[in-house]
Amino acid sequence: MSSRFSLTVVCLIALLPFVVGIRLIPARITSVGDGGGGGGNNGFSKLGPFMEAPEYRNGKECVSSSVNRENFVSSSSSSNDPSLVHIAMTLDSEYLRGSIAAVHSVLRHASCPENVFFHFIAAEFDSASPRVLSQLVRSTFPSLNFKVYIFREDTVINLISSSIRLALENPLNYARNYLGDILDRSVERVIYLDSDVITVDDITKLWNTVLTGSRVIGAPEYCHANFTQYFTSGFWSDPALPGLISGQKPCYFNTGVMVMDLVRWREGNYREKLEQWMQLQKKMRIYDLGSLPPFLLVFAGNVEAIDHRWNQHGLGGDNIRGSCRSLHPGPVSLLHWSGKGKPWVRLDEKRPCPLDHLWEPYDLYKHKIERAKDQSLLGFASLSELTDDSSFL
């Protein structure tokens, strides 16, 4: 796949043990009505309906994975298969539609889709049980390699402070802090993705990022950032706190797309380092933006810089209004609707932003077909056409 490409907008109806306390939900479910977890058909039907995704198979150039769909759940050795690309995402009822679209986009553009292994982290007390969520993923992606883990919210609930936006206070938002504890020890490297992204390029390119030196994470970063906007006046006026980060380069990065070395993460006790800042936040308010500031305090200036094409973030607008945004200049491999506005919500409310139509071809929600019957297709031909149109600036 070339570095620059055209993403065709297709017809809307086309099928395109630490204290964390986790439990594993079997990924291979044969019956939607399997009643475990209190969900059954009832909980399942409330979340759907989703169309079954097309089968995406490896090309001849792919190294065959040793994962067997019939037994990979119980085999920890399968997680250590060097041919696998490991991706971690959260899974909950509110963002389920986004998660399904994200998975679909990864598989559609992956050069070796059968070698992609998803690790889904589900909340213990979500309105849809983790078992029901697992069933829905299996029915939508019958051949997908994945595991579902239950994240106990009491692991982090007492460390969470109020934020600028209520959604940022969701305990599942902090699951990324605990991936080193949640995932099998045999998983030594993982890509973390937020649920409001789609990829339009081969995820293997991101997976192949080299974390040089002792770097623990890689992400698109923006240096020379104004850090005063990420921390409160109480932080900057404290006689000691600013000095703790004075030697770090002021580099901002979005934690919705990260390549993580879990071996270095575990060895460096980075979960504890993040928690220390969260504990301080409970005593004195030093930031307002949820789970991001602790990452900046711990990692800023020591992140492996990844091409900005791998996180075109901010497409959900700001945290208050969720206004429409345009793409950043340059090529695009991943689009990220961080911010208040989510494409599936705006599309359903018939007030989409122009870039939301780039997300829609990956949407497997069945009700979108009914909506498409009442809408004429927009005249957008490609991603490049959207970025070149001055009306989106």
Swiss-Prot record:
MF term (GO), any: polygalacturonate 4-alpha-galacturonosyltransferase activity
A cellular-component GO term for this protein: Golgi membrane
Catalytic activity, EC: 2.4.1.-
A Pfam family reported for this protein in Swiss-Prot or TrEMBL: Glyco_transf_8
SUPFAM superfamilies to which the protein is assigned, alphabetical: Nucleotide-diphospho-sugar transferases
Lumenal side: 26-393
InterPro entries in alphabetical order: Glyco_trans_8, Glycosyltrans_8_dom-fam, Nucleotide-diphossugar_trans
GO terms for biological process, alphabetical: cell wall organization; pectin biosynthetic process
Membrane-related topology note: Single-pass type II membrane protein
Pathway(s) the chain acts in: Glycan metabolism; pectin biosynthesis
Keywords: Cell wall biogenesis/degradation, Glycoprotein, Glycosyltransferase, Golgi apparatus, Membrane, Signal-anchor, Transferase, Transmembrane, Transmembrane helix
Localization of this protein: Golgi apparatus membrane
Regions of this protein lying in the Cytoplasmic compartment: 1-4
Membrane spanning residue stretches: 5-25
Glycosylation sites (chain numbering): N226
Function: May be involved in pectin and/or xylans biosynthesis in cell walls.
PANTHER family in UniProt: GALACTURONOSYLTRANSFERASE-LIKE 8-RELATED, GLYCOSYLTRANSFERASE 8 DOMAIN-CONTAINING PROTEIN
Similarity field: Belongs to the glycosyltransferase 8 family.
Protein name, UniProt field: Probable galacturonosyltransferase-like 8
Taxonomic placement: Eukaryota, Viridiplantae, Streptophyta, Embryophyta, Tracheophyta
